[in-house]
């Protein structure tokens, strides 16, 4: 019997137009004795539109940086301020556009070809730097088409930020956050808090920032649209993708 299900959002629970399919919503609603917990890179202010489909009194956000259980925040971890500012300086000097997610909102310095489900607040570089000195920062992200640009960001983080790590939520979207946060570590925190053994937990995801969920000793699964790295790691691969109720198939397989 599963006691906890942790699910990624984009590409997993949500379909390609960022919605929860009707059959999936009904399946989650009918879970009896099992907590369904979103485990996402999004921040709390980016998931409010899901409250009619999932119980948001329990959630993992910011790739494990923010954990709420029974409406109580049980874990909250920001990036090192000096390292965050250094990464912004690197971005400015290389004409990159950082996407900065703080405790209050999503900020950006310009909006070239911006495609996002959340409208950011646009600030000048100086305004953004000043804000980071006052607010906690969960993560700094970059969307880049050029693999060499992404590799350069990786190299900078490795060389200069001892408290920061990076991972990819899509092949061209890199997310930089504190080393003590991950979706997998969040599973450890919640399972210990609720005293749920790992063999009663299911983790579901589709991309590389979900990989840390799959080495925790719990059950694991992915939709057919998942990355090859994820497919090589999980216990069960659905024949269905996120546009065809893969979540329903996965839950039925383990229940």
Where in this protein do the model-derived segments appear?
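Asp-based phosphoryl-transfer active-site loop
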Residues: 2-16, 214
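Active-site phosphate-binding/coordination module
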Residues: 16-114
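Conserved acidic, metal-coordinating active-site core of Asp-based
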Residues: 90, 94-97, 101-216, 225
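Asp-based, Mg2+/Mn2+-dependent phosphohydrolase catalytic module
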Residues: 197, 216, 220, 226-255
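Short, structured coil segments at secondary-structure junctions
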Residues: 54-55, 63, 160-162, 216-217, ...
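Short, hinge-like loop/turn segments at secondary-structure boundaries
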Residues: 54-57, 76-79, 114-119, 183-185, ...
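Alpha-helical segments flanking ligand/cofactor-binding loops in enzyme cores
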Residues: 25, 29, 211-215, 231
């Amino acid at each position: 019997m599963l006691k906890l299900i942790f699910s990624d959002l984009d590409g997993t629970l949500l379909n390609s137009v960022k919605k929860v399919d009707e059959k999936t919503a009904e399946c989650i609603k009918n879970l009896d004795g099992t907590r369904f917990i979103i485990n996402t890179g999004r921040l709390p202010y980016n998931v409010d539109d899901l409250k009619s489909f999932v119980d948001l009194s329990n959630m993992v956000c910011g790739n494990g940086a923010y954990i709420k259980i029974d409406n109580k925040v049980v874990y909250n971890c920001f990036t090192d301020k000096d390292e965050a500012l250094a990464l912004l300086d690197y971005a400015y000097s290389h004409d990159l556009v950082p996407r900065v997610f703080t405790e209050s909102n999503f900020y950006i310095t310009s909006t070239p070809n911006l495609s996002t489900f959340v409208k950011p607040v646009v600030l000048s570089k100086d305004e953004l730097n000043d804000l980071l000195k006052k607010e906690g920062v969960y993560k700094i992200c970059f969307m880049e088409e050029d693999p060499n640009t992404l590799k350069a960001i990786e190299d900078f983080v490795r060389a200069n930020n001892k408290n920061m790590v990076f991972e990819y939520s899509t092949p061209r979207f890199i997310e930089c956050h504190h080393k003590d946060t991950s979706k997998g570590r969040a599973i450890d925190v919640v399972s210990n808090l609720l005293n749920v053994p790992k063999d009663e937990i299911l983790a579901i995801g589709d991309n590389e920032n979900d990989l840390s969920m799959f080495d925790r000793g719990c059950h694991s699964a992915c939709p057919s649209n998942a990355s090859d790295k994820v497919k090589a790691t999980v216990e069960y691969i659905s024949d269905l993708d996120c546009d065809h109720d893969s979540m329903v198939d996965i839950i039925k397989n383990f229940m």
